Amino acid sequence: MAAKEIIFHDGARTKLVEGVNLLANAVKVTLGPKGRNVVLERSFGSPVVTKDGVSVAKEIELADKVQNIGAQLVKEVASKTSDAAGDGTTTATVLAQAIVREGQKYVAAGLNPLDLKRGIDKAVAAAVEELKKISKPTTTSKEIAQVATISANGEESIGQRIAEAIDRVGKEGVITVEDGKSLADELDVVEGLQFDRGYLSPYFINNPDRQLAVLDEPFILLHDKKISNIRDLLPVLEQVAKAGRPLLIVAEDVEGEALATLVVNNIRGTLKTVAVKAPGFGDRRKALLEDIAILTGGQVIAEETGLTLEKATLQELGRAKRIEVGKENTTLIDGAGDKPNIDARVKQIRAQIADATSDYDREKLQERVAKLAGGVAVIKVGGATEVEVKEKKDRVDDALHATRAAVEEGIVPGGGVALIRVKQAIAELTGANVDQKAGINIVLRALEEPLRQIVANAGEEASVVVATVAAGSGNYGYNAATGEYGDLVESGVLDPTKVTRTALQNAASIAGLLLTTDATVHEAPKDAPPAQPAGVPGAGGTGFDF
């Protein structure tokens, strides 16, 4: 085990605070509509230019071990806020730095750190309750666009794209972000259920212009095993042929004789069919097949349900208005499933989401809900260079998360004003002793910091703006983008309540832990290896090393 070094008391805290300040100073230059960019070096590929606070924080590793501990603790604030709310990482970092800075003064003056922390916690709890009171729900597409625009650092086109996507697929719908292939941003909306499996043979294509196999009013056969013997399929094929409608086969795999026969019949025009592999793997595959069955009003042909291919009838087959099968995706449009059954399935999956322990499982379950309840929208981010697309994509992701947070818990006036407005509720608090009251005062001062930083980044005098905003009430605040005072909600400067709340709670949590720290234990620096000799005596000054 490597030797450890221990630092105590003020020496430890001072180094930790230095680390906090180094990271926070790099992150906070990005805050607000006039925030600056940060360039991140990459060990390979182009440098990354970003205004995303958490992206900057994640890149920072300091050479000094103790400073690095402080920096990593604040990095945790940014990461946790990003995970919970998807945005507000820079605000959280600025708040954490302010609480640590103010708290350090009181600790150095001899106040009890534990009582300071109790005062901080009391003030934050009161601030959160007040935020909930001043929050109002998002009801219009315009408000959603405004929230997204603010989170995307004032880029209106991103806000409009996200609002349009939510309009099209609903609040439950899946919205994904991809690299575009043009200079402009694009929005693609897939209505109906889409899964990531394409045709098993290009001979199924009947729309060469779009390279798709398109089936109108088809039957849908769902099977959880491989199909290789055509004799298993013949009874179903004969019934479908008599009905005079096309057939989509979704199975674990279709191969050999069975696939060859389907292709030949398709080419001859005897029976229009398309075969695709079932999406997913293992238990997830079974669940997805069941989703498709419920959406199309069919049943999965599986041994577990006592159904076999040989005895399958048209009653067990699903139906849809139209199906489009590409090389990589299959889209089912307007399935014939009963709405009560679909709603019951959605409710069941939502219950599984509540019980899910891993983020991956939760994400996949939410995707299934969206596919059943709404649809899928894809925002394709355009740009002139790879660096520009990457930077813009980060902002679109932030804006998307902020929008979801706004839908969830509502909105408050942005630009740091909401935190100024909750000060009144905190100012009325009393602590159990002088030290706790000092903790409350720490939060009162820290709540001004996001507004101060937004104003400083805009090149204005922070103290004057803070005093003017504090003298106002309600939504009155400073719009840093225009340099004017007014009603921020009317002018579209909004923040999701969840983002502001999460940023404050996470900042106070980590800052409180830092203030109550009295020792650090870290790996001792290794001694430098002895220098190599410049050459070998008698080698004529050749400088060769051996």
Curated annotation (Swiss-Prot):
Forms a cylinder of 14 subunits composed of two heptameric rings stacked back-to-back. Interacts with the co-chaperonin GroES. HAMAP family: CH60. Residues 537-546 have a biased composition (Gly residues). Its EC number is 5.6.1.7. Coiled coil: none annotated. Belongs to the chaperonin (HSP60) family. It comes from Burkholderia thailandensis (strain ATCC 700388 / DSM 13276 / CCUG 48851 / CIP 106301 / E264). This is Chaperonin GroEL 2. Keywords: ATP-binding, Chaperone, Cytoplasm, Isomerase, Nucleotide-binding. It is found in: Cytoplasm. NCBIfam families: GroEL (TIGR02348), PRK00013.1 (NF000592), PRK12849.1 (NF009487), PRK12850.1 (NF009488), PRK12851.1 (NF009489). It is an enzyme of class 5 (isomerase).
